[in-house]
Amino acid sequence: MSIPNNLRYSEEHEWVKTEGNEVVIGITHFAQSELGDIVFVELPEVGATIEADEPFGSVESVKTVSELYAPVSGKVVAVNEELSDQPELVNESPYEGAWMVKVELSDASQVEKLLTAEKYAEMTNQD
């Protein structure tokens, strides 16, 4: 499984891509492979505030329903609407087509506290 080096990772298997004062958030390849076939994704609305380490949505697979935990705090400025019609994108393209939300950061230092690709690989035994 590939773990992109340009992203940061949470212990709950979300990835974060920094774009200026905003971040894009999704779930990792490891997470989607553990969940199995994704059949539904529930995400917050644009304008919602999310708090680090708190649930902000959920992913339903044929195996289970898993909550999504916010790796950072901020305001949701965009939601990937394609996932409501094509939840399988999470399995097919977890790092590109299946981004979940874009968030305007309330504290940019939170990103630095997330795991590097190397640390995430160690945590998931993917090194």
From Swiss-Prot:
The Lipoyl-binding domain covers 22-104
Q: How is the cofactor bound?
A: Binds 1 lipoyl cofactor covalently.
The Gene Ontology biological process annotation of the record reads: glycine decarboxylation via glycine cleavage system
Instruction: Give the protein's cofactors.
Output: (R)-lipoate
Identify the Gene3D superfamilies for this entry: 2.40.50.100
InterPro entries for the chain: 2-oxoA_DH_lipoyl-BS, Biotin_lipoyl, GCV_H, GCV_H/Fam206, GCV_H_sub, Single_hybrid_motif
Tell me the residues on which N6-lipoyllysine occurs: K63
Tell me one Pfam family matched here: GCV_H
* Superkingdom as given in the UniProt entry: Bacteria
Family the UniProt entry places it in: Belongs to the GcvH family.
- What functional role does this protein have? The glycine cleavage system catalyzes the degradation of glycine. The H protein shuttles the methylamine group of glycine from the P protein to the T protein. Is also involved in protein lipoylation via its role as an octanoyl/lipoyl carrier protein intermediate.
How does the annotation summarize its subunit structure?
The glycine cleavage system is composed of four proteins: P, T, L and H.
- Report what the protein is called: Glycine cleavage system H protein
* Species annotation: Bacillus cereus (strain AH187)
